[in-house]
A protein has these predicted regions:
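Juxta-kinase regulatory segment immediately upstream of eukaryotic protein kinase catalytic domains
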Residues: 2-42
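An alpha-helical support segment within catalytic cores of ATP-dependent transferases
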Residues: 29, 36-38, 154-160, 164-165, ...
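ATP-binding glycine-rich phosphate-binding loop
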Residues: 42-60
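ATP-binding pocket architecture of kinase catalytic cores
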Residues: 60-166, 172, 178-182, 206-207
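Active-site Asp-x-Gly
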Residues: 210-212, 224-248
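Conserved catalytic-loop position in the HRD/HxD motif
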Residues: 216
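Catalytic-loop signature of eukaryotic-like protein kinases
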Residues: 220-222
């Protein structure tokens, strides 16, 4: 999943230096950047780390001339990360009228993508739990974007959020939270109650109408932009599943 961008204030160069474990990949990146740079007004000397996530993907920010102050580069080694779902879902979101990073260039062989930059400020950065009414316009925007996304849904386009996937994700709760975080053995009555509850959840979800599901639709993945709709990130794991999933 995509980590939040680094803070709005520019970090020191040492904090954003790009390190490469593979010199050949580093050379391929430099060659690719030099090749696409002129068409997009990129300034290669300004490339720096923007964020990383729990996968093998990394994101760099690079300055550009003209109206685009900066662009984002995704580094997704193809032997570790498949970029095709990201490209597909970015296109689906654009078709639905949802603001997501536009894929400007894609080196499929090496897994390098040039994206437009939706900024540094997430919705999580600006909402104030102590003043819920002040955050209502942002939540309204988020719901509007979600509705547009759902209304564009078509079966057979995205992978199904089927029983196997639901059960796999539910199993994370007893394993990681109850077992590892709380140190409680999942057995006896606890196990029976969980299994009974999980069966109800699975059946309820499978009986719901199916739409496009982002799967990580939350404030840290929504970008606040002055005078524009919220931008949506971290959508590459989207599926076709229960209509209630994202809004929950």
């Amino acid at each position: 999943m995509t980590a939040p961008p680094l803070p709005a204030s520019e970090p020191t160069p040492s904090a954003t230096a790009i390190l490469w474990a593979d010199p050949q990949r580093a050379a391929a990146f430099q060659n690719w950047l030099a090749g696409i740079g002129p068409a997009h007004g990129l300034l290669p000397a300004t490339v720096r780390l923007a964020s990383a996530d729990a996968s093998f993907r990394r994101y760099f920010r690079i300055d550009a001339t003209g109206s685009a102050a900066s662009r984002i580069v995704m580094d997704a080694p193809p032997e570790k990360e498949n970029s095709e779902p990201f490209v597909q879902v970015a296109r689906l979101m654009a078709e639905a009228g949802v603001t997501a990073p536009q894929v400007l260039e894609w080196d499929r062989t090496h897994g390098f993508l040039l994206l437009d930059d939706l900024g540094r400020e997430t919705m999580l950065d600006v909402i104030d739990p102590a003043r819920p009414d002040a955050s209502r316009p942002l939540y309204d925007q988020a719901i509007d974007a979600l509705i547009r996304w759902q209304l564009a849904s078509r079966p057979g386009v995205l992978p199904p959020y089927d029983r196997a996937l639901l059960e796999r994700e539910l199993a994370l709760f007893p394993e990681w939270y109850i077992g590892r975080h709380r140190g409680i053995a999942v057995e006896g009555q606890i196990k029976e109650r969980l299994e009974r509850s999980f069966r109800l959840i699975v059946e309820s979800n499978l009986a719901s109408p199916s739409v496009y599901v982002h799967r990580d639709f939350m404030p840290r993945n929504l970008m606040v932009r002055d005078g524009a709709d919220l931008g949506v990130l971290d959508f590459q794991d989207a599926v076709y599943g229960p209509i209630t999933y994202d809004i929950a």
